[in-house]
Amino acid sequence: MITYKTDIKASLQSSESSMPVLAMCYDFDKTLTPDDMQAQGFIQSVGYDEEQIKQFWQESNQLAKKNDMDNNLAYMYKMIQEAVGRFYVTREKLMEYGNQVELYEGVRTWFERIREYGLEHGVCIEHYIISSGLKEMIEGTEMAKEGAFTKIYASAFMFDDKGVAVWPAQAINYTNKTQFLFRIQKGILDINDTGVNDYVKPEDQRVPFRNMIYIGDSDTDIPCMSLVNANGGHSIGVYDPVKKDKDKVYKMMRHHRIRYYAPADYTNGSKLDTLVKQIIRKTAAYEVLEGEYVHCKHEAEE
């Protein structure tokens, strides 16, 4: 079991210290894991064999199209419907499926390793999940249970008094993902807090976009990648290190959606590991200069 030395409360208080915060934001499916989380146990448990997993998604997408429905709401509805007569979809059940999810090599220890590297260089690292997948499944992973993430933003169910999923509580799609970057920027993490719309001076932003890293794998990450890129941050496209299909990251690179790409290999010394550590060192150096700028600016305005 990995012990996380920096808890969420301490991490959130770090903005009040002299240590700059670097927010690392991740998609989940095919970014931290090789496949969709639902396809790693749940879909099979409702009667689809390995050869029929694509059929589940096709039926879900057809449901969305037929009813002018959000694709994520459609798959959540279908999950509940397909489970009828088989088992109850409870938070605990979904967390069990999440615990079965296969992770890319190195992911299991990545978050604390990078956090410790940041602290060694005077940078507080916070890890965020921004995913269209299921929050309950992500919460079932070992690293989530151990406190790796400052916040998990993902689609989620509402549960009745018996603990059974009855309705979507939150649906995250590729466009509304960007709101969570603004929440992180301003330090307003509660999804119901309307303060995210308030103006915050650049020097008062808790995590300016230049201090964000967004790691994703596909078109659904483009709005977040573009927002981070356009504001001086770092967007990284990842691809499966086994299949080595770079078509998506090449396309994102040509269209200026990402600044870098690397295999989804999270082991110590990998290309991704080296790249992120370079960004951490750059952040540490830049924020010293930025602090001096803010000091001069405030003194001149007094």
For each feature predicted by the language model, list its residue ranges:
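C-terminal cap/substrate-recognition subdomain and adjoining C-terminal extension
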Residues: 105-128, 132-302
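Alpha-helical substrate-recognition element adjacent to the catalytic core
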Residues: 2-161
